Amino acid sequence: MSYLMLDLLSLDVSEAEAEMLRHPQVGGLILFSRNFTSREQLIALVQQIRQIRPEILIAVDHEGGRVQRFREGFTLIPAMGDILPAAKGDMALAKRWACELGFLMAIELLACDIDLSFAPVLDLNGISQVIGKRSFSANPDEVIALARSFIEGMAQAGMGAVGKHFPGHGSVAADSHIAQPIDEREGEVIFNQDILPFKELIFNGKLSGIMPAHVIYPKVDPNPAGFSSYWLKQILRKELGFNGVIFSDDLGMKGASFAGDYVGRAKAALDAGCDMILVCNDNPGVMTLLNGFVWPEAAPQHPASLLKPNMAQTALALENSARWENAKQLAEQIQLAQQAKV
């Protein structure tokens, strides 16, 4: 059971939303900026959610840079693409910084009882404006090195990592939130470049989850990756050996319209191999699925509960206030270094 992750409309849980959260197919909740005014309000909201569904996986997109949902009362995490330039190309220094920023991002969320950030971005920085500096670099080896360090920092705080957007979103100009991106490159290029960060981090056991792209790679497969059993079952599961959780990207995005209405999208994503599907910014769409979709009878083979934090590790990390404070100063230092270049 529990194949669906949904969201909330505002700063607290309405009665209708509470009923949805109690549905056995709901296993996750993603928070957005509209759900946040302050750290204190966020903690109260999470407590309200936990009273309704104590075990639910609470997630957020909190990568740093322009994709950071909570700001007031949180450290502003630099964009991942700013780390190596701020270190003036010193990879050893940049890796240390990436580790501390991963720790900082994770511990500030875990301190508010939020389980997961959908991070890091493993796309290569190419022509995609929606990716841009969300990516560590245009170079696969640099992405691998910095992402690995960032993930290790997250793990030291007790949080698992979700790599996105498999097999790579960086080489399409279109934004899948509002359009259907098509990557016309040959499969050989994708496998020799974009997929390398995913491959390497899976091989080294660093990824607990992966989110595929709503991108079509027609030279490889006619379906968007998130609706493609070739990409998810053949490549990701079989060839790369990934045994973590596969999250769909938001089924409300334009890039998901390929599969029809919400029922069609949910079926296509689950049939392709997703373990949990996200439906955001559309409560009627959620209700359509909860009331009108025939869900799989069996539980997900890779349940999203695998992404729950390592609470013993988190407890230790919360005691390390000196590391937390030093990481805050580092984040500010990197931000200032990049502002000075503008």
UniProtKB/Swiss-Prot annotation:
One term under GO cellular component: cytosol
One of the GO biological process terms: peptidoglycan biosynthetic process
Record SUPFAM superfamilies: (Trans)glycosidases (SSF51445)
Reactions listed under catalytic activity: Hydrolysis of terminal non-reducing N-acetyl-D-hexosamine residues in N-acetyl-beta-D-hexosaminides
Site (Important for catalytic activity): D175
Swiss-Prot/TrEMBL keywords: Cell cycle, Cell division, Cell shape, Cell wall biogenesis/degradation, Cytoplasm, Glycosidase, Hydrolase, Peptidoglycan synthesis
Family annotation (InterPro entries): Beta_hexosaminidase_bac, Glyco_hydro_3_AS, Glyco_hydro_3_N, Glyco_hydro_3_N_sf, Glycoside_hydrolase_SF, NagZ_Beta-hexosaminidase
Residues annotated as catalytic: H177, D249
Main location: cytoplasm
UniProt keyword Cell cycle, yes or no: yes
Record-listed substrate binding positions: D61, R69, R134, K164, H165
GO molecular function: beta-N-acetylglucosaminidase activity
Top-level division of the source organism's lineage: Bacteria
Subcellular location: Cytoplasm
Signal peptide annotation: none
This protein's pathway: Cell wall biogenesis; peptidoglycan recycling
Described purpose of this protein according to its UniProt entry: Plays a role in peptidoglycan recycling by cleaving the terminal beta-1,4-linked N-acetylglucosamine (GlcNAc) from peptide-linked peptidoglycan fragments, giving rise to free GlcNAc, anhydro-N-acetylmuramic acid and anhydro-N-acetylmuramic acid-linked peptides.
Family: Belongs to the glycosyl hydrolase 3 family. NagZ subfamily.
Protein name per its UniProtKB record: Beta-hexosaminidase
The organism of origin for this protein: Shewanella oneidensis (strain ATCC 700550 / JCM 31522 / CIP 106686 / LMG 19005 / NCIMB 14063 / MR-1)
